[in-house]
Amino acid sequence: MPTEMINESVKDITYDAIKIGLASPEKIREWSRGEVRKPETINYRTLKPEKDGLFCEKIFGPNKDWECHCGKYKKIRYKGVVCDRCGVEVTKASVRRERMGHIELAAPVSHIWYFKGIPSRMGLILDLSPRTLEKVLYFASYIVLDKGTTDLQYKQVLNEKEFREAYDKYGDRFRVGMGAEAIMELLEAIDLEKESKDLKRGLKESTGQKRARIIKRLEVVEAFRESGNKPEWMIMTVVPVIPPDLRPMVQLDGGRFATSDMNDLYRRIINRNNRLKRLLELGAPDIIVRNEKRMLQEAVDALIDNGRRGRPVTGPGNRPLKSLSDMLKGKQGRFRQNLLGKRVDYSGRSVIVVGPELKIYQCGLPKEMAIELFKPFVMKELVAKGTAHNIKSAKKMVERLQPEVWDILEEVIREHPVMLNRAPTLHRLGIQAFEPVLVEGKAIKLHPLVCTAFNADFDGDQMAVHLPLSVEAQAECRFLLLSPNNLLKPSDGGPVAVPSQDMVLGIYYLTLQKPGDIGEGKYFKSVNEAILAYENGVISLHAMIKVRRTGLNAEGVEESRTIESTVGRFIFNEIISQDLGFVDRSKPENFLALEIDFHTGKKQLKKILEKCINTRGATQTAETLDAIKSLGYKYSTRAAMTVSISDMTVPEAKKDIIERAEKQVEDIAKNHRRGLMTEEERYKAVIETWKEADDEITKELLSGLDKYNNIFMMADSGARGSDKQIKQLAGMRGLMADTSGKTIELPIKANFREGLDVLEYFISAHGARKGLSDTALRTADSGYLTRRLVDVSQDLIIREVDCGEGTDEIPGMEIKAFMDGKEVIEGLEDRIIGRYACETIYDDNGELIVKKNHIITPKRAARIVASKAFEDPNATIKIRTVLSCKSHIGVCAKCYGANMATGEAVQVGEAVGIIAAQSIGEPGTQLTMRTFHTGGVAGDDITQGLPRVEELFEARKPKGLAIIAEFGGTVTIKDTKKKREVIVTRTSNDTLESKAYLIPYGSRIKVMDEQVIEAGDELTEGSVNPHDILKIKGVRAVQDYMIQEVQRVYRLQGVEINDKHIEVIVRQMLKKVRVENNGDAEFLPGTMVDILEYNDVNESLAAKGLEQAEGKQVMLGITKASLATNSFLSAASFQETTKVLTEAAIKGKIDPLIGLKENVIIGKLIPAGTGMKHYRNVKLDTDQNQEITFSEDEFDNGNYEGNFSGNDFKQNFYENEDFNSDEEVSFTEDEYFEDEENDLSTENFDDLKFSEEEE
């Protein structure tokens, strides 16, 4: 019996943080396995590494597993032996990926990151300007190291001529140096404690530029003082050599070698270093040595960051060589290419085809792909069943595809879900799990209803398949990722698996009613009889007939009714559950009425599904969806709708309407010639005229179309096309925009039915081309925006249930409906659904609607909005929001409210930050890029669409800036020939205070003379700078403004996003405070600190009676906010990698590994969802003898307490309105959550015996 081998080398390391710092020369020597002395790489004849060279086996380890360089020791039995002939340790070749070497430099060199970065850290700590420093480092100037008895200054910089003069004057009484040696000596001499005290004293006395410089210097000095890094470590005396397998050399076909750029860079350093050593031994003249030292400095610079200073070192074909910094930077760098995204095994990709016969939780997997993916599972089964004797023969069987393999594959595949992913994965619905069904051919079959979520179509799209291996991964796929669990959009909670195109058309045709059709008015004894009559052509699908239905009424007595409807609707109702709430079942006459007795298009289907998910839960909805899909396809086939040219009837009135419009345009032109209107007014009037004509024709056309016209039915059902397309086919094409987006005043009067003439065709070509190029640009912009949003919000996770636990006051905000003038952008109801109320709310009769700190469900929200108090559009209601959450890391479940994707209270561990970023970024592609021109010259551009969203989130000064009043008061408008001014006057403490605002040419004034305004009101039209709002009106106002503006852009495009997603991002943008006066706090003035940390420090200072720090809250754009995060790993992998790492190393930063990115980078489970600590460290002490007994009714009703899957939970949540008041359910939400956090040990299980008595 073989004993189990335990691999000693693999230790289970758990760590909670990562620290970065400067490496001291001692540390570099400690990492190293030996010094690289020669520039040689490998011997060109034997192809073996040269000794002491860049690939030396003695330093880095053997080239082949368990084999030394000279071949004396081969085979694993010599493991760990060091060969006495060649000095190579016998071990695995993979150590060549981890063992480092070093180069001892003959002269110190500076590290370019610290000398050249902005700001230059070396320059700040020495108080030298970067230019001066460069002259010293690169041997152009001398620096005084010791002034002796002369009147030179310490650290004074002398050029060649000044040095000569000083030398002639003072002789040897002073000492100068140049190059990195001199700088190193200066750095060693710095006393950080003394420097810090001096600077702090200087800070109190100085102002302006000088003060700013001192703050910058103090920051660097404090960083060195606190981190334990020594300033002289910025100068290198030893260069580390990275492992050879990370800079490989491979032989090409022609016997030539391809090598990594790193090797060239190292070779130059070694060559120059060896030459310098020789020159020093020979005692060469100073000027030659100096030149060699400068070249060595440049060689090391090129290795660390090629091209940062001077011309980059180039390889063959003038291509700059890739340095260590380039290895980390950008999309191809180490961070984004290898750490944040890796290629994985057990995956494949193929073209997708439609699989209408599949259930919604299935996908078709090609046999060849399945056998490859499930290979190890199949092999294990073969051995277990005894079909194969050992793994080797099992592998052969699988590779030869023997017949018995297929049967086993069928078994293995059962109940083992796979994940499908379509790139680009814009939101979490882009990856879903399905149960595989084996199919012939090589294409993956996809269920048509999940296409919307993947944004997939079948014109050649490809999808990737991934196989979850571990039991946990399979369980997560089944319970979280399986497509029936993803029926709702996380962005707005609407259904995502809505039937489209053919299915919609089929259902529309099925529920159509045509008066006077064959068999109208006939009676049938049952639905089946009616269907039989239809199948035999006695009645039509759309004829109104009467059918007898029988059922149990409210008293439980059987009762029959005659119901009038169409056969189609009877058929449709067979598959729809009859309690969705479309019919009021409390009325006795309705109890047998059809649930869906109306014409059903896409909009209606969406409503049906919404109600179905809310009342029946996921499993039932999935079945209904599949039934709708089958019916839809069946009847769209039966309908056999076609489109022919005769379907497009051009309205009679078209000719007259166009003639009228032409006459009107002629009149406008006449007025313009007579000087009665300006060019801009004329242009606007012409466009307006044609728009009206166009609308009129469209109206005529649509009213003239037959209700049963095929094209009309397609558009009306929502299957494909819209009024716009019908208008172009049979009305007029209308006005077109030119390439700049300005509307061409000459419309296209023809339609496609009549055909366009050459000029019209040419004009319309503009639009077609612009459409395509816009889409391409939009996709890239939208992707980049999503990336920034994810980066700024990725560490926001639900960390606790309630941040206000134990306090009386519930943090929250007053909110009201968003209005744009009279138009509602977002109603109050939309804004309060799924939030927690801060106060108890009653209706008009004083009946309780929702208790304090309980959730507002859709039904409750409807009741709140219906009550009299909320008829006023400005009525407010106080709810909990993410913006007022007091959690220190992440946010709490109650402030977030309901999870949109399940409609229930959000669970601890949900990565709400990433969901928010995806919800905002995913519709980004639909937003128009176009900057709308208000026409004409002077009209200013107001940015809209994607650029506007970007402008808001980056907190930029907007284009078309509105001027706002800094304080409230009375307005007077002065309008003279030269200038227009708005003067705001206010009286404070009996003194008149006024401020004049100059109005630029072309801006429209928004206020009236003598109007009384408030601080922060707009004086001119345009967008407001959010920073101004923050300054004048404060944080609350700017939060509201941001949410409202982002919502405006999305809602105008018809995209619905829940407020809470925008709130999450805005919370991240407003996290920092700029310290203005540090008081007795440790902060440096002018630095940014986290607002929660700032408040905590101030609270503790106040408690001690010390002076508090003063600061102003600042708003950072999302890019800046991402870089200002506590995690240097996350920031470095985002942008400006070298800058982030330079700063982090000097400060000796510690990454607490709180967010998701940093954990992905180091390869730990992410701290969200099931990877959270309190879900991972659960111990189950099971007592074998204990049984859990259910009483029978409980078991049948299935209301056992426990964490059931989202949708069952949701079903209870909706049916049972008072879900979270204690009377109805045996646990409140808090208890429900408390349980999860406990260590589930036996004492919790003791009372799990349910018995009859308790009932």
UniProtKB/Swiss-Prot annotation:
Region of interest (Disordered), ranges: 1220-1255
Protein name: DNA-directed RNA polymerase subunit beta'
EC number(s) reported in the record: 2.7.7.6
Enzyme class: transferase
InterPro entries: DNA-dir_RpoC_beta_prime, DNA-dir_RpoC_beta_prime_bact, RNA_pol_asu, RNA_pol_N, RNA_pol_Rpb1_1, RNA_pol_Rpb1_3, RNA_pol_Rpb1_3_sf, RNA_pol_Rpb1_4
UniProt cofactor(s): Mg(2+); Zn(2+)
Name of the gene encoding the protein in the UniProt record: rpoC
Cofactor mode of binding and number, as noted: Binds 1 Mg(2+) ion per subunit.
Annotated S-S bridges: none
Taxonomy, superkingdom: Bacteria
Organism per entry: Lachnoclostridium phytofermentans (strain ATCC 700394 / DSM 18823 / ISDg)
UniProt keyword annotations, A-Z: DNA-directed RNA polymerase, Magnesium, Metal-binding, Nucleotidyltransferase, Transcription, Transferase, Zinc
GO cellular component, one term: DNA-directed RNA polymerase complex
